[in-house]
Curated annotation (Swiss-Prot):
InterPro entries: P_starv_induced_PsiE (IPR009315), P_starv_induced_PsiE-like (IPR020948). This is Protein PsiE homolog. It is a multi-pass membrane protein. Belongs to the PsiE family. GO terms for cellular component: plasma membrane. Pfam families: PsiE. One of its GO terms (biological process) is cellular response to phosphate starvation. Its main location: membrane. PANTHER family: PROTEIN PSIE. NCBIfam families: PRK02833.1-3.
Length: 139
């Protein structure tokens, strides 16, 4: 009898341990992202203050990287706010931002740029479906 009760508790114990490991890893990741965000902010401010050697693409790339880091920190915050759940729309936001960064950084090939823009369009359509799925069900 006692043994069966312990076996019933085992999945809950494993789940709790894994949740603690996940939360610890996410907190560590948030700290690393905050440090990276501070570095990007410093780099951006130095680029803006030292305008003699600034390449506009470098500034744009750093700005988009800032928003990527900021978005991932926001994703971690939302994970804890929403009861240990990652909302899908935040991953789509991160994907759109990453593709924008790729277009800014890698713009030599026009075919690649069009493909990247198509990927952004697909993600925007997916985002609209996610955001308006409840309204679409009522139609």
């Amino acid at each position: 009898m006692e043994e069966s009760l312990e076996l019933e508790k085992l999945p809950r114990i494993i789940t709790d341990v894994l949740k603690i490991v996940l939360c610890t890893a996410l907190i560590a990741l948030a700290i690393v992202l905050i440090i990276a965000l501070v570095k990007i902010t410093y780099t951006l401010s130095m680029m803006v203050l030292n305008t003699s050697s600034v390449v506009p693409y470098d500034v744009a790339e750093q700005a988009v990287m800032f928003f990527l880091y900021f978005g991932f920190i926001g994703l971690i915050v939302q994970y804890f706010k929403s009861g240990y759940h990652f909302p899908l729309r935040y991953f789509i936001y991160a994907g759109i931002t990453a593709m924008l960064r790729l277009i800014i950084v890698n713009h030599e090939s026009s075919v690649d740029t069009i493909l990247f823009a198509g990927a952004i369009l697909i993600m925007v359509i997916a985002l609209c479906l996610v955001l308006y799925s409840n309204k679409l069900k009522n139609i």
